Amino acid sequence: MASSTLSHVTPSQLCSSKSGVSSVSQALLVKPMKINGHGMGKDKRMKAKCMAASIPADDRVPDMEKRNLMNLLLLGALALPTGGMLVPYATFFAPPGSGGGSSGTIAKDANGNDVVVTEWLKTHSPGTRTLTQGLKGDPTYLVVENDGTLATYGINAVCTHLGCVVPWNTAENKFICPCHGSQYNNQGKVVRGPAPLSLALAHADIDDGKVVFVPWVETDFRTGDSPWWA
């Protein structure tokens, strides 16, 4: 009997109060008529329209402007903790400062201060490799030799595969890229791919007590080849 009564409900009456279907919950109870096993597509479409029309305006999906605002607020919330973690590394990606003349750049430490050799060697033990800001603002390792002196070269930390910054792994005594596993020995020579080339070099000269990076254009002492970066 119920199915017979519902079969006389027309699409135009579906959302009408006269038909007794005036809410979303009531509309969901109305089943489409079936003829030879096939549902009435028109009734289904009308039910969807009725459901959408019955939802209060405040409960509907927000318009594009509101969604964009919510996205911005979400990104801002995520950026707060992330930004704090990136502060120590920010100076390595900042534009290089002035100094060192047209052919060289004074090395900067993680706080953006000039690297003074005597002070640096007091706080960095033999065998350490520490990031500084080098030529063109690139992150560049300063190397303290095993005898406690500063190496005459700096090692560019940008991986030659896809440009990730390669950290120094003290336990393994090599540079290991976290992105795709490329490895370089303690002088930056590539020993395992997918990186195709060794890390670039720069001269680490001393001028007025400060470390100055100068472009390396001579033969790469690690490979005996011309420098690919020059």
Swiss-Prot record:
Residue range covered by the transit peptide: 1-25
Alphabetized InterPro entries for the sequence: Cyt_b6_f_Rieske, Rieske_2Fe-2S, Rieske_2Fe-2S_sf, Rieske_Fe-S_prot, Rieske_Fe-S_prot_C
Protein name: Cytochrome b6-f complex iron-sulfur subunit, chloroplastic
Family: Belongs to the Rieske iron-sulfur protein family.
Cited Pfam families: Rieske, TM_PetC
Subunit and partners: The 4 large subunits of the cytochrome b6-f complex are cytochrome b6, subunit IV (17 kDa polypeptide, petD), cytochrome f and the Rieske protein, while the 4 small subunits are petG, petL, petM and petN. The complex functions as a dimer.
Topology in the lipid bilayer: Single-pass membrane protein
Gene Ontology molecular function terms on file: 2 iron, 2 sulfur cluster binding; electron transporter, transferring electrons within cytochrome b6/f complex of photosystem II activity; metal ion binding; oxidoreductase activity; plastoquinol--plastocyanin reductase activity
Catalyzed reactions per annotation: 2 oxidized [plastocyanin] + a plastoquinol + 2 H(+)(in) = 2 reduced [plastocyanin] + a plastoquinone + 4 H(+)(out)
Rieske domain boundaries: 117-213
Transmembrane segments: 73-93
CC annotations in GO: chloroplast thylakoid membrane; plasma membrane
Subcellular location: Plastid, Chloroplast thylakoid membrane
Cofactor: [2Fe-2S] cluster
Signal peptide: none
Note: This protein is 1 of 2 subunits of the cytochrome b6-f complex that are encoded in the nucleus.
Cofactor note: Binds 1 [2Fe-2S] cluster per subunit.
UniProtKB keywords: 2Fe-2S, Chloroplast, Disulfide bond, Electron transport, Iron, Iron-sulfur, Membrane, Metal-binding, Plastid, Thylakoid, Transit peptide, Translocase, Transmembrane, Transmembrane helix, Transport
EC code: 7.1.1.6
Function: Component of the cytochrome b6-f complex, which mediates electron transfer between photosystem II (PSII) and photosystem I (PSI), cyclic electron flow around PSI, and state transitions.
Disulfide bonds: 164-179
List of residues binding [2Fe-2S] cluster: 159, 161, 177, 180
